[in-house]
Amino acid sequence: MTIIVDYRFPPAINAEKQAKTIAIGQTAGTWSERHSHRQEQLQQHLGEVVGIREEADGYKVARVRFPQINVENDIASLLTMIFGKYSMAGAGKVVGVYLPETYGTKAKVGITGIRQRLGVYDRPLVMAIFKPALGLSAQDHADILREVAFAGLDVIKDDEIMADLPVAPTHERLDCCRLVLEEVRQQTGRNVLYAVNVTGKADELQRKARLLVKHGANALLLNVLTYGFSVLEALASDPAIDVPIFAHPAFAGAMCAGSDTGLAYSVVLGTMMAHAGADAVLYPAAYGSLPFDPQEEGKIRDILRDRNVFPVPSAGIRPGIVPQVLGDYGRNVILNAGTGIMDHPSGPASGVRAFFEALARIEAGDSFDPANLPEGALKQAILEWG
């Protein structure tokens, strides 16, 4: 079996030459007469340039085919092969990676499992982020959770910045919030997921994740790009960690934002996350607060859903843009809001209710024009943020 990778080069770069350099340099490493006696042995490991196309802007996309036998069915060896040292060679960007269906680690829970655990099948899920990100005590987290959970929230997560800090140690946050989750379940019959941020050194992370699950965590959050894809793979493959893992995109810009270098966002936040075992992946929405290419966003959405991974467009999501989100995503999406819920003029519970009012108006085909909105949480949100 083979792995296909697309590299995009600016007009000033000799794409044919660079593609051949990658095909040989990132596989056998050399292909000279000195090694002719090993030709048959080396041939099976050699990459091959299989096509080059020119785009309208003069850029060229070279497609290189790599033997799958060169890698270990994981993301680390894959990235080392397809871009490794060549990532330091100058202009040239990985814009597509096409892997066999069986490559890597599949989501353990995914879209279907998350919906089953919540008992919600016919609408988008609504998710919040604890805010302020830092400075809240463990009990503060529980108080906020109680307010938004009883308003109907499906999922809440730690802010990615919230590590295992003295102000609110991870296990204390979980202990306080777990009581609220049980209270909500007993009084309403509803389950709410709390994605606890797993942090620490590599030799501690898996043990900490197991302990969190053992002590009642029903979801985990991981900053995959700062801790490494190998950590995600280890957590996703661990039978003792039987909860959904929400993958955060922190640091993705350092890998992907360059126009002619690095890897495309759809490769890192789509293909790699989907083949490393994430159950849900957060990433910026094009109409949110961070600049993001709508084409890349669409690719990420489709790549994730093809492998039963929940897309979670984020950063600036607010009730007033729910029609646009659903127009792009349909119902299989998680609406993830931080300030769009926590900074609602009437409080976080009203922030949650505003999202559900938005979903109800879309279902009914009603207008979002403030002049046509009844007084309530949604109208307040739209007047505040548009």
Curated annotation (Swiss-Prot):
GO terms for biological process: carbon fixation; L-methionine salvage from methylthioadenosine. GO terms for molecular function: 2,3-diketo-5-methylthiopentyl-1-phosphate enolase activity; magnesium ion binding; ribulose-bisphosphate carboxylase activity. It catalyses: 5-methylsulfanyl-2,3-dioxopentyl phosphate = 2-hydroxy-5-methylsulfanyl-3-oxopent-1-enyl phosphate. Mg(2+) binds at residues 157, 159-160. The active site is at 85 (proton acceptor). It is an enzyme of class 5 (isomerase). Its EC number is 5.3.2.5. Pathway: Amino-acid biosynthesis; L-methionine biosynthesis via salvage pathway; L-methionine from S-methyl-5-thio-alpha-D-ribose 1-phosphate: step 3/6. Its cofactor is Mg(2+). InterPro entries: Diketo-Methiopentyl-P_enolase (IPR017717), RuBisCO (IPR033966), RuBisCO_lsu_C (IPR000685), RuBisCO_lsu_C_sf (IPR036376), RuBisCO_lsu_fd_N (IPR017443), RuBisCO_lsu_N_sf (IPR036422). Binds 1 Mg(2+) ion per subunit. The keyword Hydrolase does not apply. PANTHER family: RIBULOSE BISPHOSPHATE CARBOXYLASE, RIBULOSE BISPHOSPHATE CARBOXYLASE LARGE CHAIN. Has no RuBP-carboxylation activity. This is 2,3-diketo-5-methylthiopentyl-1-phosphate enolase. The gene is mtnW.
